[in-house]
């Protein structure tokens, strides 16, 4: 599946957020979006998912304008997991995750739907929480359950806004590796906003680095994760070492 952004711009009254964002990605691959706070990363994800309508430009999926796609078709094609969602439904974890099957089941869950949910819960390492109350989970458990809900939707394109927020280092690595593996298994295109440069470098197939509402650099980790790019975009000193063929960032004290 191909995802294109053609000259996408978005503005709030008196403030331009996105400016001429253009890219093309085809699955299966994991794409990481990097950049400081406030550069338009979440706004870009919202434009892709039609939460926001671009002020200019188009978002295309397999050469079709997303604005021309019916809502149910979009729901089957694109999944979205927001940043640190505050959803706290008074229901079991398994029932909360089952909501992700709605585009396929029309609210009538089948045995297949339940089996898909339990499989993802197991792979996320939270199958033991299936009968727990969703609104009683810790922040990290809640984040994993929200990711599970996005994954059981079985979208062709999965959009993730900081999917490892609220997770400790071990689970950040585990979840990102699982996302990469599922992306390949399911032949998905996964696009995730990430603030950890080294996790993005380690697991992403392609990286977008944003600055001032547009794409500053794009390509492989080797192309994007460079000292010059990081110092320009983040205004911090760093050095880069090789970590098994991937760049690894070591931050240094002080700003430029």
Task: List PLM regions with ranges.
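The feature captures the beta-strand-to-loop junction immediately N-terminal to the Walker
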Residues: 34-36
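Helix-to-loop junction immediately C-terminal to a conserved catalytic motif
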Residues: 49
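Conserved ABC transporter NBD signature motif
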Residues: 57-65, 74
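Conserved ABC ATPase "signature" region
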Residues: 98, 111-129, 154
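Conserved ABC ATPase signature
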Residues: 133-137, 141
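Catalytic Walker B motif of ABC-type/P-loop ATPase nucleotide-binding domains
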Residues: 158-162
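ABC ATPase nucleotide-binding domains
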Residues: 233-256
